[in-house]
């Protein structure tokens, strides 16, 4: 019978080559499985896969109980997925997760979103940096053009940072004004880019960088070394531009995604359409954006609450 390490290798290989999961997902799966393996070693449990039972899993759950609920859910889900795979492949006789109920309550935090004024401030600052350096030759000016294209596309499409970082040149159709992204579960979706300024930003970036993009292997957004612009680099440029635009709170690419969805909902766009744009498998995931901000709430209650239609004589209201 195999040990946990050997089973982890089999499972990760299955996830990569048969399920086609992203490198990011595989990375976190690997981290979670290694942590579980280390837990067994430190606590002198057998690493033989057949020796792992419900009691071992409960002890492991207790050992990670101080982590954030979302992190705990992911770690347990990773291990459960491995055991389900082993059961399906007939590598184990008993799956310890069978008839084992694990409930992890996760606080329902509202998404961190920007209002339209904050988005506009970031856009204006980013374009200003380009104008300030238009007379400067070299990479500095080109970098500003790239940064504008990145921020415009984040807000125009609501894509995930991983989807933007891995966007291929062949999937950017500037003639038909659309992009094709590969999201979670290797699922592809097409998103139209309809805003004139966003289109202009992409076209200007591509005209300047297209030869380097081809030399760099076909990834659309590249760095100064003609390599893929990493997720971390995108996060850094977004945070930097937001901070220099005068926004003190932490702004990330995912905040742009949240803001994209929330602001569309506030414009009464159908939630099912937003679900497709975001690449959510379930509409339950999209429904987190149905929260309403204070100003919108105030407007709705002022204009639409039925109390405004009540006619009560003044003498009844006299004190």
Where are these regions (language model features)?
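Conserved catalytic core of the tyrosine transesterase superfamily
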Residues: 1-319
């Amino acid at each position: 019978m195999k040990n946990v390490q050997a089973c982890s290798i089999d499972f990760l290989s299955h996830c990569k080559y048969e399920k086609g999961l992203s490198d990011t997902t595989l990375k976190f799966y690997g981290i979670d499985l290694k942590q579980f393996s280390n837990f067994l070693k430190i606590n002198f449990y057998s690493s033989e896969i057949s020796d792992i039972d419900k009691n071992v899993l409960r002890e492991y759950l207790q050992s990670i109980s101080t982590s954030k609920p979302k992190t705990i859910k992911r770690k347990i889900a990773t291990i459960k997925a491995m055991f389900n795979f082993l059961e399906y492949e007939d590598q184990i006789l008993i799956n310890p997760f069978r008839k084992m109920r694990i409930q992890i309550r996760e606080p329902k935090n509202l998404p961190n979103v920007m209002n339209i004024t904050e988005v506009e401030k970031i856009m204006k600052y980013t374009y200003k940096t380009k104008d300030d350096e238009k007379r400067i030759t070299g990479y500095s000016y080109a970098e500003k053009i790239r940064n504008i294209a990145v921020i415009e596309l984040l807000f125009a499409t609501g894509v995930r940072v991983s989807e933007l970082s891995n966007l291929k040149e062949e999937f950017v159709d500037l003639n038909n004004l659309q992009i094709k992204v590969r999201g979670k579960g290797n699922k592809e979706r097409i998103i139209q880019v309809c805003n004139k300024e966003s289109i202009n930003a992409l076209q200007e970036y591509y005209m300047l960088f297209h030869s380097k993009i081809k030399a760099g292997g076909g990834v659309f957004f590249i760095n100064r070394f003609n390599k893929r612009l990493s997720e971390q680099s995108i996060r850094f440029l977004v945070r930097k531009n937001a901070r220099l635009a005068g926004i003190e709170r932490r702004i990330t690419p995912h905040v742009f995604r949240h803001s994209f969805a929330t602001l569309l909902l506030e414009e009464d766009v159908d939630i099912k359409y937003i679900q497709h744009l975001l690449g959510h498998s379930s509409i339950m995931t999209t429904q987190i954006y149905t929260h309403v901000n204070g100003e919108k709430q105030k407007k709705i209650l002022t204009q639409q609450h039925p109390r405004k239609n009540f006619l009560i004589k003044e003498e009844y209201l006299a004190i």
